[in-house]
């Protein structure tokens, strides 16, 4: 797996997790779509997932455009059900989430927000 750090907004970063075997990817906290979209298109990446760690705009601002452009699935905490639009996959504390590419354990870390993972 390769991890690319993409600068978003003035002082935030998104992380693109890329399976080097097939170029499938998951973007974490796309605060805006433009820099993420540019990297994905320039590098012929197949965006499958958008993982949001919490509902603040500087972490979800790029969701809509990226979801619609790539038909990517949005993953987020079930506690952000009412705060993040169009969540496709709800995550809960302690859950092991996996597909044929990615696998991770969900850890709830409320404090910054109640739905923070």
Indicate where each model-derived feature is located.
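Generic hydrophobic segment detector
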Residues: 7, 74, 78, 116-117
């Amino acid at each position: 797996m390769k991890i690319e750090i993409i600068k978003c907004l003035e002082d935030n970063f998104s992380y693109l997790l890329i399976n080097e075997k097939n170029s499938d990817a998951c973007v974490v906290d796309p605060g805006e779509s433009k820099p993420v979209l540019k990297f994905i298109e320039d590098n012929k990446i197949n965006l499958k997932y958008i993982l949001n760690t919490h509902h603040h705009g500087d972490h979800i601002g790029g969701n809509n455009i990226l979801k619609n452009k790539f038909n990517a699935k949005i993953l987020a905490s079930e506690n952000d059900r009412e705060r993040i639009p169009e969540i496709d996959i709800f995550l809960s504390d302690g859950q092991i989430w996996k597909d044929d590419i990615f696998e991770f354990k969900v850890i709830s870390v409320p404090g910054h927000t109640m739905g923070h993972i």
